[in-house]
């Protein structure tokens, strides 16, 4: 599905360097975001989050295989970018920054895979089922939860969301 996705522009868009003013500002911004473990846990499992959104919005014929397939197919692109940029997680740079630890945090920080996959899935589900505002809110909550967990810098989430939009655009044009 994404074998011919043009990843080069996302390799050119680099995160701020570890010891930069921008990274320092992002860590300061994260420290102002309260840890909300309940919210973070609710949105850590992307498939379940979208399944719940479908249920809450009375989507009767919801096919949970769609989200699973998009996660599986987009993972190699996301992992390639994470390895390429190799940005440490915020709590790895600032040892005083508390984080909600999750199994999903065992890769580099940039870009946010949850943000990318959330936006990709929300866009596809919106096309298939309607309910655009509900699915897009779930994507936003998934992305926001990563900052609330202190798992990602805001720029990770922003660029992850943009990656998700471009992955969706790729699907629509191929």
Describe the residue ranges of each PLM region.
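Short, solvent-exposed mixed-charge patches
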Residues: 1, 173-174
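Hydrophobic alpha-helical bundle signature of multipass membrane enzymes
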Residues: 1-149
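A short hydrophobic/aromatic micro-motif that marks alpha-helical segments and, especially, helix-coil
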Residues: 128-130, 170-173
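Interfacial helix-loop-helix junctions of multi-pass membrane proteins
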Residues: 141-172
């Amino acid at each position: 599905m994404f074998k011919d996705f043009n990843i080069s522009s996302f390799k050119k868009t680099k995160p701020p360097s570890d010891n930069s003013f921008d990274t320092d500002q992002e860590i300061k911004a994260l420290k102002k975001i309260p840890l909300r473990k309940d919210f973070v846990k609710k949105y850590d499992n992307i498939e379940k989050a979208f399944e719940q959104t479908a249920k809450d919005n009375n989507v009767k014929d919801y096919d949970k295989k769609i989200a699973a397939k998009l996660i599986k197919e987009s993972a190699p692109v996301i992992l390639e970018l994470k390895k390429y940029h190799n940005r440490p997680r915020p709590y790895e740079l600032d040892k005083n920054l508390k984080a909600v630890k999750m199994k999903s945090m065992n890769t580099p920080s940039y870009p946010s895979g949850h943000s990318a996959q959330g936006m990709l899935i929300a866009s596809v589900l919106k096309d298939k089922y309607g309910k655009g505002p509900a699915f897009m809110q779930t994507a936003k909550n998934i992305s926001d939860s990563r900052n609330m967990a202190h798992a990602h810098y805001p720029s990770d989430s922003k660029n992850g969301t943009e990656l998700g939009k471009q992955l969706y655009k790729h699907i629509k044009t191929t």
